[in-house]
């Protein structure tokens, strides 16, 4: 399985998934006009990964500077999907990065953490 790379734009985050390392990174702004069209390939890619060659541990690193409501709904769906894979025996961990003074992104991460109930680290940083 090859690497998935979706380049960042003004409205969409960079998505990099390295199946050999089991690391998915989502970074940037997430305000696409149609979140379903943007994120559906990621679901398909992750399905193939978990069906064919999951690593011992899968890490999901999320570092968003801004996210709109449509993307937020998708992301919750995606994290529920990861929770399902976790419940099926795949070791998964989410690392949610937020700027030290960005309460909105921090609170969103805390909401996701309490909603999906899987290993979920809240990591603050200074930009």
Regions found by a protein language model. Give the residues of each.
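Amphipathic alpha-helical interaction surfaces in cytosolic regulatory modules
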Residues: 37, 42, 62-112
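A general structural motif
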Residues: 21, 55-59, 89-93
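A short, well-ordered alpha-helical element
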Residues: 12-15, 33-56
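A cross-taxonomic marker for long C-terminal extensions/tails that follow the last structured domain
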Residues: 110-127
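N-terminal amphipathic/basic leader segments beginning at the initiator methionine
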Residues: 1-17
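A generic structural motif
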Residues: 30-32, 66
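Short, aliphatic-rich beta-strand segments
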Residues: 22-28
């Amino acid at each position: 399985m090859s690497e998935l790379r979706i380049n960042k734009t003004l409205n969409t985050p960079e998505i990099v998934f390295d199946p050999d390392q089991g690391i998915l990174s989502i970074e940037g702004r997430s305000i696409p006009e149609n979140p379903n069209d943007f994120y559906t390939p990621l679901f398909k890619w992750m399905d193939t990964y978990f069906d064919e060659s999951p690593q011992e541990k899968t890490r999901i690193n999320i570092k968003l500077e801004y996210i709109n409501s449509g993307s937020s709904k998708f992301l919750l769906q995606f994290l529920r999907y990861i929770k399902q894979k976790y419940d099926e025996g795949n070791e998964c961990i989410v690392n949610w990065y937020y700027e030290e003074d960005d309460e909105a992104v921090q609170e969103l991460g805390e909401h996701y953490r309490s909603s999906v109930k899987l290993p979920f680290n809240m990591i603050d940083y200074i930009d």
